[in-house]
């Protein structure tokens, strides 16, 4: 007898294909990180200085000799504008001296007309805040947070002990549900804290519980420890995201709100994709716990970036007078605004149910039943973010031009339900891939307009601030995030995958149609436009 060595070509080809796609994922993640840095640097060092210089030159050419906004830094363009301001200040001082010395009434009137026409005594208000200030700090923190997403259930299973609160299967999903639940509970309080103490201090303060949660997970010896660590991190996540979202909402003008919110959504999507991919690779190389050390490191970097980049020079928040007979409770405030409640119940919550229940729970289980590999499951789930990232700016710009954010949200809600029907009696990995891609495209047209539509509805109430509306919206969305996996898991106990997808899709589409009918009825009565 003799042994003949051989190589299974199919196995080798499969491994090479897996390596190729893993390398591609890393390349995409690194490219997105580089893109975030390039966008911020180009905006702060090129676009904004040239915009400020162009505005100053156009005003000077038109005879407007005010003190122009010079921007930040000591670059050539900023120094050029400061030189113009010096010349204008010299003319202003000479004009002031002439006005003080001239006694003739006619000459004084002509000098006063020159002063009004040239605006020599006007000084532009200096606003240092920009959307780009929050982009990099938010991205780095969210990147740190998403590092554990791909392996958290496996991490809990590895450290499960008999003394944990529940059985092993329940404990594997409990930290995820706890994370969403804590965010839902704490977000309204986070919004109030931002209004009281400001965006920058709260961003930095939110990093304390976030880092504490990462450290607790690193030191964890049981599922209970991981559960507590993720709950602690959720407090920091709620504070930081509301702080950055309110910061962006404060800076952008009303006409560009959807585009400004698209920056927030785009950062979250980019960080989700990059963090999930890089975290999986780090866990494979170094182990689960080492990833939390990287999360702590990136969170500290986010703290340094937030300290250096976030500005305290923000426009004053709107101050609305609250009638004495109205409660200041956030829940009571929400219930009094019917349009806000409709958006939350029929659009925001269903969108999160689809995201957490379908994408995070249904898709992995369904693909595993179709004998897809773990790498294939990860790539399919990442496609959702990959679709949203490039489409979100286009969708938000389209919503700004159309000026119909509410109807954009309604149509996208109906479409997201219809998309899920594609899985009914279609059991294939390719069909799941197509549905996830289509869902990403639909949600690209939903995410930013949903935030704007909620703020527009909130502005109709005299006692809801911008930050309060955002926090209430986020709280409601987290409720959908908590109940989504529970609802889908309950249906999977008694129904097959195709039936669950069909029921979920039909339900969401019907909710969207009900929202359309109610909104059209309100519009016809003139109560909401």
Model-derived regions, located:
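Membrane-proximal alpha-helical signal-transduction linkers
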Residues: 46-67, 81, 85-95, 99-102
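Residue-level signature of mid-helix packing/kink "hotspots" within the transmembrane helices
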Residues: 180-188, 272-273, 385-393, 481-482
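Juxtamembrane intracellular "pre-TM" segments in multi-pass secondary transporters
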Residues: 114-128, 311-344
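Structural signature of the two symmetry-related core transmembrane helices
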Residues: 201-215, 296, 407-421
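Cytosolic-side ends of inner-membrane transmembrane helices, especially those
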Residues: 30-47, 61
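Helix-to-loop junctions at the C-terminal end of transmembrane segments
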Residues: 185-198, 392-403
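Helix-start (N-cap) segments at beta->loop->alpha junctions
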Residues: 4-22, 162
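Intracellular juxtamembrane helix-capping segments at the cytosolic ends
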Residues: 239-252, 446-460
């Amino acid at each position: 007898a003799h042994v003949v060595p051989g190589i299974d070509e199919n196995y080798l080809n499969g491994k090479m294909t897996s390596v190729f796609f893993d390398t591609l994922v890393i390349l995409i993640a690194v490219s997105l990180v580089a893109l975030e840095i390039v966008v911020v640097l180009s905006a702060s060092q090129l676009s904004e200085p040239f915009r400020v210089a162009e505005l100053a030159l156009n005003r000077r050419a038109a005879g407007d000799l005010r003190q122009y906004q010079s921007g930040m830094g000591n670059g050539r363009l900023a120094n050029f504008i400061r030189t113009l301001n010096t010349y204008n200040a010299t003319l202003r001082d000479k004009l002031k001296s002439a006005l003080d010395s001239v006694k003739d009434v006619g000459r004084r009137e002509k000098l006063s007309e020159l002063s009004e026409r040239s605006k020599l005594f006007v000084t532009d208000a200096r606003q240092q805040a920009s959307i780009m200030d929050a982009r990099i700090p938010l991205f780095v923190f969210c990147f740190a947070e998403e590092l554990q997403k791909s392996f958290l259930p496996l991490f809990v299973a590895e450290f499960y002990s008999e003394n944990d609160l529940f059985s092993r299967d329940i404990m594997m999903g409990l930290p995820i549900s706890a994370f969403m639940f804590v965010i839902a509970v704490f977000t309204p309080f986070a919004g109030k804290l931002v209004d009281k103490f400001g965006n920058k201090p709260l961003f930095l303060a939110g990093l304390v519980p976030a880092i504490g949660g990462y450290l607790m997970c690193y030191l964890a010896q049981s599922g209970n420890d991981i559960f507590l660590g993720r709950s602690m991190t959720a407090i920091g996540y709620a504070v930081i995201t509301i702080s950055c979202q309110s910061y962006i909402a404060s800076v952008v003008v009303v006409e560009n709100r959807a585009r400004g919110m698209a920056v927030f959504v785009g950062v979250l999507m980019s960080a989700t994709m990059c963090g999930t991919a890089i975290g999986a690779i780090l866990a494979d190389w170094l182990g689960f716990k080492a990833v939390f050390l990287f999360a702590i490191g990136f969170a500290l970097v986010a703290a340094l970036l937030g300290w250096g980049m976030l500005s305290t020079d923000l426009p004053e928040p709107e101050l609305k007078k609250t009638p004495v007979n109205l409660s200041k409770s956030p829940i009571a405030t929400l219930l009094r605004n019917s349009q806000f409640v409709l958006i939350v119940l029929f659009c925001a919550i269903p969108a999160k149910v689809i995201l957490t229940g379908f994408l995070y729970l249904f898709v992995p289980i369904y693909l595993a039943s179709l004998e897809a590999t773990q790498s294939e499951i990860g790539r399919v789930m990442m496609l959702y973010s990959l679709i949203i990232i490039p489409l979100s700016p286009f969708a938000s710009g389209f919503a700004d031009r159309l000026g119909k954010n509410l109807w954009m949200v309604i149509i996208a809600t109906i479409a997201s339900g219809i998309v899920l029907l594609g899985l009914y009696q279609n059991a294939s990995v390719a069909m799941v891939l197509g549905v996830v891609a289509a869902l990403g495209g639909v949600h690209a047209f939903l995410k930013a307009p949903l935030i704007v539509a909620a703020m527009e509805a909130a502005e109709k109430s005299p006692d809801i601030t911008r930050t309060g509306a955002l926090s209430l919206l986020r709280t409601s969305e987290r409720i959908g995030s908590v109940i989504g996996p529970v609802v889908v898991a309950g249906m999977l106990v008694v129904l097959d995958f195709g039936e669950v997808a069909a029921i979920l899709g039909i339900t969401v589409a019907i909710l969207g149609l009900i929202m359309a009918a109610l909104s059209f009825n309100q519009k016809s009565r003139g109560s909401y436009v």
